[in-house]
Amino acid sequence: MRPEPGGCCCRRPMRANGCVKNGEVRNGYLRSSTATIAAAGQIHHITENGGLYKRPFNEAFEETPMLVAVLTYVGYGVLTLFGYLRDFLRHWRIEKCHHATEREEQKDFVSLYQDFENFYTRNLYMRIRDNWNRPICSVPGAKVDIMERQSHDYNWSFKYTGNIIKGVINMGSYNYLGFARNTGSCQEAAAEVLKTYGAGVCSTRQEIGNLDKHEELEKLVARFLGVEAALTYGMGFATNSMNIPALVGKGCLILSDELNHASLVLGARLSGATIRIFKHNNMQSLEKLLKDAIVYGQPRTRRPWKKILILVEGIYSMEGSIVRLPEVIALKKKYKAYLYLDEAHSIGALGPSGRGVVDYFGLDPEDVDVMMGTFTKSFGASGGYIGGKKELIDYLRTHSHSAVYATSMSPPVMEQIITSMKCIMGQDGTSLGKECIQQLAENTRYFRRRLKEMGFIIYGNEDSPVVPLMLYMPAKIGAFGREMLKRNIGVVVVGFPATPIIESRARFCLSAAHTKEILDTALKEIDEVGDLLQLKYSRHRPLPLLDRPFDETTYEETED
């Protein structure tokens, strides 16, 4: 694959390794001062002048080996063939499991599902359904307790055995800074607020559900983000899906990254605006859409678009990649578009102060028109926020469906957010927040480096706490999840349709609560399972650096 300007060659289904430092927009094309692109086993170096990036920006998307891709398609073909065979046997009542057959009283009903979706659920998903929705019965901290369950009808239903699998290492929760716990100052403060305010508000903010705690939280969020004002919501998903329709509508254009979260996709669709998709993190693709939007305008009428809104995420939760924000902002300014940044996974998890991807790149928050994030991950709570200009927030207070109609956030949840955010900012009189941010960065670099040394294909940015490990073949999705649980490691496995059909993966989420001993235990088991299932596909395995200390990460800017 020929690298595009700026070292961005992240195309589907082809993948390539890449790292970019100090890029800039020049004459409409993205340049970079140092870039490394690896494709088909070859390394290309590009050196040009530039100055957008103040720190190294390294992301890896190794190309799927051809043999693995072919075998993955063959695996799906075999499963599909046996699926049709099982449907035939069910039709003639030879198949002993009858849960997938239609009930007599519903035979004349209109189907709820499309044919392919129905077939996929019956014959492929059900084979590995036991890997999802596992119930836990403890705080989702570094370790969790899982309720054991069994199925006697091929995963169509489950029964609890009464046993508890204790001390399972939790590599799946978004507990980035370790605030998901039931002891400590945050939990004590939330318990006190519960005594004063109760558990719920039973009203909307527009009526009698606007507490002083809401005002305190929003002022704190605005100060934390470095913006004029902020507005909070009780649900993170609705923060996207219900606010985007308030910002754009008919006659507006949305430019959305192809890997954006479902909440952004739903919000864009509900808005009624025209939607165009650009390739993931590909600035050339985005710039082409911006140029076309300005040159050609709206379809048929050719009138100028009322607004152009760019939708991106800070950390992409399935890829582990980080948005190329300096380049996006440069393009946004050049073509006079608006920028909507979803920091659900990056807020708290990136940057020397934990203020997200804007802090990570050392950018000005005022360059982002709409800053969105959630409290469900780094803050160990629930809900979401929108930050920006005061005029924007005042407008959303009266036009956002989530602000006008939804019940306001629970007081104990708000106190959890307030206390944890003050801890991150250092306003609690301790350095705990700073230590958690640093610990997460160290854990991320260490875990990613060790997996690459073992020979696994790992996606994403080297600073992203979301670590996708590629499994590819459908049979290995269930096998990996089950084998890891046998070894007391809880992981999340993901397959089609949440990922491309040949890019099934396991997704690890690092936490500041993970100690080196916990990570080493998990890595040892992952290494053994990788050998057992033959998952070490990488052709670019780095040599282990035995003399490198564990405490290796620094947020000091790299000299150009």
From Swiss-Prot:
This protein's name: Serine palmitoyltransferase 2
Keywords recorded for this protein, A-Z: Acyltransferase, Endoplasmic reticulum, Lipid metabolism, Membrane, Pyridoxal phosphate, Sphingolipid metabolism, Transferase, Transmembrane, Transmembrane helix
Gene that specifies this protein: Sptlc2
Function, in words: Component of the serine palmitoyltransferase multisubunit enzyme (SPT) that catalyzes the initial and rate-limiting step in sphingolipid biosynthesis by condensing L-serine and activated acyl-CoA (most commonly palmitoyl-CoA) to form long-chain bases. The SPT complex is composed of SPTLC1, SPTLC2 or SPTLC3 and SPTSSA or SPTSSB. Within this complex, the heterodimer consisting of SPTLC1 and SPTLC2/SPTLC3 forms the catalytic core. The composition of the serine palmitoyltransferase (SPT) complex determines the substrate preference.
Catalytic activity: L-serine + hexadecanoyl-CoA + H(+) = 3-oxosphinganine + CO2 + CoA; octadecanoyl-CoA + L-serine + H(+) = 3-oxoeicosasphinganine + CO2 + CoA
Cofactor: pyridoxal 5'-phosphate
Provenance organism: Rattus norvegicus
InterPro entries noted in UniProt: Aminotrans_II_pyridoxalP_BS, Aminotransferase_I/II_large, AON_synthase_class-II, PyrdxlP-dep_Trfase, PyrdxlP-dep_Trfase_major, PyrdxlP-dep_Trfase_small
Distribution of this protein across tissues and organs: Expressed in astrocytes.
